[in-house]
From Swiss-Prot:
SMART domains assigned to the protein according to its UniProt record, in alphabetical order: CoA_binding
GO molecular function terms attached to this record: copper ion binding; metal ion binding; nucleotide binding; succinate-CoA ligase (ADP-forming) activity
Disulfide pairings: none
Annotated metabolic or biological route of this protein: Carbohydrate metabolism; tricarboxylic acid cycle; succinate from succinyl-CoA (ligase route): step 1/1
Recorded family membership: Belongs to the succinate/malate CoA ligase alpha subunit family.
Name of the protein this chain belongs to: Succinate--CoA ligase [ADP-forming] subunit alpha-1, mitochondrial
Subunit structure of this chain's protein: Heterodimer of an alpha and a beta subunit.
Compartments reported by the entry: Mitochondrion
Top EC class, one word: ligase
A GO BP entry: tricarboxylic acid cycle
C-alpha cells in the first residue's frame, strides 16, 4: 500500500474520531464517514479483554511516529488493519502525520483517542523515558521495539512495572506482538502470518518468523505470536505468555523458542509440568554450541557461572513433556506430527 493510501485511511479514522466526539456540525459528512470507518472507530464501549494481550479492539498509539521507523511501521500497521489512533512526538502536538493526530504526550493522546496500547520506536537513550511515560498514563500495553537500551535504565523501568498492576510491557529489543488478521504491533512481516491455532512465544525475532512460516506452511496457522525480546530485563516472559495460551480457546498448540542465558526456559518448563496442560508444546533452544562467558547476539544470551546452558534448558523442557527439536527447520513438522498423534487435526 502506498504512503498516500496510508495517509487517507489514517485521515478518515482521525475525522471519525472527531465525529464520535460531537463534531457533526463542523464535519457535515460525519454520518457517511462513520460508516466508511466503522472497522477503525474509537467507540468508548468497553470490550472484553483480549485473550492474549491484543485483538481487533486494541487501540494503538505510536511513540516516535514522525521518525523514519515510526513512519514506516505505522504505515504497515494501518495497512494490516491495526487500529492506529494517534502518534506522540514532543513539540509536534496539534499536527497530523499519516492522517493521524499527533500529541505532545501519551496522556493527551490517551485522553483524546481512548488508546489503550502503545508501540515505541524511540532511540535507545530516550526509550526508557518513553516506557515510563506510558506507565504513568496507565496504558494497558506497551510494546517497545528499541534495541540497545542501557540496562540500568531498564532496572528503573522494571521497578516501575513491579510497583503497579495496570500496564504490561512487551520488550524491549523485540519484534512485537501480532494476532493474525486482527492486530499487528511491531516490525514483523504481516504477510507470513495466518489466523490459526498455534501460540508462539520467542526470545528471538528472526526465529519467530521461521516458526510462523513453518506453522503456516503445514496449515496450522497462529493464534497469537509474542516476541518477548532478548534483553536480561524485559517486561513479559515465557511464563506470562504460557499462562495466557493455556486458557485461550483458540490456541491448541504452543511453540516456545528460547536461547542460552538466564533461567526463563527452566521457569517455563516448571510451569508446563505443573499445569498438566494437554496442549502440545514444541520448543527450540538456540546456542547449543555457545562457549561459556561469551555473549551470543542478545544481551541476555550468555552462559555465566555455569548457569543458563542450552543443555540444562533442553533437559528441563524434556522432563516437562515438551518436544524439543534440534533444528528450527523442524518446528512446523514436529508440531504437525504431534497434532496427528493426538487426533487434533480437523478432517
Amino acid at each position: 500500500m502506498s504512503r498516500q493510501v496510508a495517509r487517507l485511511i489514517g485521515s478518515l479514522s482521525s475525522k471519525a474520531r472527531r465525529c464520535s466526539t460531537g463534531g457533526s456540525e463542523v464535519f457535515p459528512s460525519c454520518q457517511s464517514l462513520t460508516s466508511l470507518t466503522q472497522s477503525r472507530s474509537f467507540a468508548s464501549d468497553p470490550h472484553p479483554p483480549a485473550a492474549v494481550f491484543v485483538d481487533k479492539n486494541t487501540r494503538v498509539l505510536c511513540q516516535g511516529i514522525t521518525g523514519k521507523n515510526g513512519t514506516f511501521h505505522t504505515e504497515q500497521a494501518i495497512e494490516y488493519g491495526t487500529k492506529m489512533v494517534a502518534g506522540v512526538t514532543p513539540k509536534k502536538g496539534g499536527t497530523e502525520h499519516l492522517g493521524l493526530p499527533v500529541f505532545n504526550s501519551v496522556a493527551e493522546a490517551k485522553a483524546d483517542t481512548k488508546a489503550n496500547a502503545s508501540v515505541i520506536y524511540v532511540p535507545a537513550p530516550f526509550a526508557a523515558a518513553a516506557i515510563m511515560e506510558g506507565i504513568e498514563a496507565e496504558l494497558d500495553l506497551i510494546v517497545c521495539i528499541t534495541e540497545g537500551i542501557p540496562q540500568h535504565d531498564m532496572v528503573r523501568v522494571k521497578h516501575a512495572l513491579n510497583s503497579q498492576s495496570k500496564t504490561r510491557l512487551i520488550g524491549p529489543n523485540c519484534p512485537g506482538i501480532i494476532k493474525p488478521g486482527e492486530c499487528k504491533i511491531g516490525i514483523m512481516p504481516g504477510y507470513i502470518h495466518k489466523p490459526g491455532k498455534i501460540g508462539i512465544v520467542s526470545r528471538s525475532g528472526t526465529l519467530t518468523y521461521e516458526a510462523v512460516f513453518q506453522t503456516t506452511a503445514v496449515g496450522l496457522g497462529q493464534s497469537t505470536c509474542v516476541g518477548i525480546g532478548g534483553d536480561p530485563f524485559n517486561g513479559t516472559n515465557f511464563v506470562d505468555c504460557l499462562e495466557k495460551f493455556f486458557v485461550d480457546p483458540q490456541t491448541e498448540g504452543i511453540v516456545l523458542i528460547g536461547e542460552i542465558g538466564g533461567t526463563a526456559e527452566e521457569d517455563a518448563a516448571a510451569l508446563i509440568k505443573a499445569s498438566g496442560t494437554e496442549k502440545p508444546v514444541v520448543a527450540f533452544i538456540a546456542g547449543l554450541t555457545a562457549p561459556p562467558g561469551r555473549r551470543m547476539g542478545h544481551a541476555g544470551a550468555i552462559v555465566s557461572g555455569g548457569k543458563g546452558t542450552a543443555q540444562d534448558k533442553i533437559k528441563s523442557l524434556n522432563d516437562a513433556g515438551v518436544k524439543v527439536v534440534e533444528s528450527p527447520a523442524k518446528i512446523g513438522s514436529a508440531m504437525y506430527e504431534l497434532f496427528q498423534e493426538r487426533g487434533l487435526l480437523k478432517q
